[in-house]
């Protein structure tokens, strides 16, 4: 697809889906060391359903969607759902959950106060425990088994029927809308949130394409 800096990132994703719908988009290892995969078409379908669910529960540009998860297919679904509707996506290191219990999750609490997410996806049980302790008023989503009734299983979210509301929400997106808050390491203090926009993300993709020209990898 064209990589004009005026495009929205979701346009690039949707163009790829249209070009290679049955191609594997992501693969991850399962507990038995086999591969779990998802095609571009299925990734879009599930992300669109999740985006519809977020819209129906009040998501917009003022309600960031935080993800406390490792790199995973589930993480990608939430990320693309956020990009589809213009709700800022905020990935948070699982280390905040794994290592934070000893100090009452101080770093996670700081980030929650900074970002004020309307929704939080927690993949592991450790992540669920952390966000439940620190953000009980946010709308909580989990990948598999929920440790508490407060969590909504992702399986429910990705089966939401899509309506015309989703297309209207995507149509309103612009190149300069904020797509993500990326957190700094906080090595010299507390983490800071760095804004990313659609324009910035498209430029980053264009730079990668330029670097790979002539390699046969793009």
Show where each model-derived region lies.
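A short N-terminal helical cap/helix-turn-helix that marks the beginning
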Residues: 3-27, 45
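Conserved pre-ATP/AMP-binding loop-to-beta segment of ANL
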Residues: 21-24, 142-143, 156-183, 190, ...
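Conserved AMP-binding/adenylate-forming core of the ANL superfamily
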Residues: 22-77, 97-106, 156-162, 196-199
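Conserved AMP-binding A3 loop
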Residues: 37-41, 171-172, 179-206
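Hydrophobic alpha-helical segments in the ANL/AMP-binding
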Residues: 55, 73-93, 208-209
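Short beta-strand elements of ligand-binding domains
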Residues: 69, 138-148
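Conserved ATP-dependent adenylate/AMP-binding module captured primarily in the ANL superfamily
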Residues: 90-133, 161-163, 204-218
